[in-house]
Regions:
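Hot-dog-fold acyl-thioester-processing enzymes
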Residues: 1-98, 158-231
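Catalytic-pocket segment enriched in acidic/His residues
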Residues: 204-272
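HotDog/MaoC-like acyl-thioester-processing domains
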Residues: 1-31, 76-79, 97-181, 244-247, ...
Length: 296
């Protein structure tokens, strides 16, 4: 365990990770850093929190943190691990493919938290290698929030794992509303979250990485969906990132009574996920889920 006195600055970490990327040799069998980085006492910056709530569509001034906000608090620690010399995957081109969030209790916006981040594993993927990054938020000794994010480094594989069963095509979820996303969403979210990856900021910088225009942050798309959908105090949220959202753009938000949600543009799904209410149980651990209203 490595205890940090303050959160690392994301800008230098992004630059360092970019410089080291050409020298990485990604492989699912490679060794990876086992250290757990810890911020022992962190209080959210209420000004940045309010900016985050505004850009993502959450109500401002609520007592509790949005369900996605602890990811922002832990992201600098994750970036320090993934930009390090001993992390085998190149930071440039690393794609956030999914996230699972478990919130065991509401987190007050004015609370003080211990944040810890570690890399759980590397896994073979048909398109390369995937890293699983775990973030945990504690109050005293209790885990009150945790997440698992997967990040994919695309590269040629000698023996790609066999494809699993094909997903059954399902009908699109019922459309709820259409959203017009402004071209500055990436810059506004970057200012609120600290994640100023150039692919999100401007068409010119996005073109350097092969995108015709700037793209929205994946975690902004999930947060925006959850601001519309809502989440119980004790909840499990899962989301998979399917395709980038170009900025500016128009997308359709859709959901059903079973807790599923998606963001799509015509037949193209950008993100899909589900919200489940967790039953009563101890803070630490993974209590079972119970259906949301409409699941019966």
């Amino acid at each position: 365990m490595i205890v940090l006195s303050s959160a690392p600055s994301l800008g230098p970490l992004l630059a360092l990770g970019a410089l080291r990327s050409p020298f990485k040799k990604p492989s699912a069998g490679a060794d990876f850093p086992r250290a757990r980085l810890v911020l022992a006492s962190l209080r959210p910056d209420l000004r940045k929190l309010a900016a985050y709530e505004r850009v993502c569509g959450f109500a401002t001034g609520d007592d509790g943190l949005p369900v996605t906000y602890p990811h922002v608090l832990g992201f600098p620690l994750a970036m320090r691990l993934m930009s390090g010399r001993d992390f085998p995957l190149p930071l440039l081109g690393l794609v956030h493919t999914s996230i699972e969030i478990v919130r065991h209790a509401e987190l007050p916006g004015d609370g003080t938290y211990e944040i810890s981040v570690h890399i759980e594993k590397l896994s073979p993927h048909r398109r390369g290698t995937e890293a699983t990054v775990v973030t945990e938020v504690r109050v005293a000794d209790d885990v009150v929030w945790e997440s698992r994010s997967t990040y994919l480094a695309r590269h040629r594989t000698e023996t790609a794992p066999a494809d699993g069963p094909r997903e059954q095509e399902r009908a699109p979820l019922p459309a709820v509303e259409e959203w017009r996303i402004a071209g500055d969403v990436g810059r506004r979210y970057g200012a609120a979250s600290g994640d100023r990856n150039p692919i999100h900021l401007h068409p010119l910088t996005a073109r350097l990485f092969g995108f015709p225009r700037a793209i929205a942050h994946g975690m902004w798309t999930v947060a925006r969906c959850l601001a519309a959908h809502g989440a119980p105090e004790r909840a499990r949220v899962t989301a998979e990132f399917r395709a980038p959202v170009l900025l500016p753009g128009t997308v359709t938000y859709a959901e059903d009574d079973a807790g599923r949600f998606e963001l799509r543009d015509g037949d193209r799904v950008h993100v899909e996920g589900r919200v489940e209410r967790l039953g009563p149980g101890p803070l630490q651990g993974r209590p079972g889920s119970v259906p949301l209203p409409g699941d019966q």
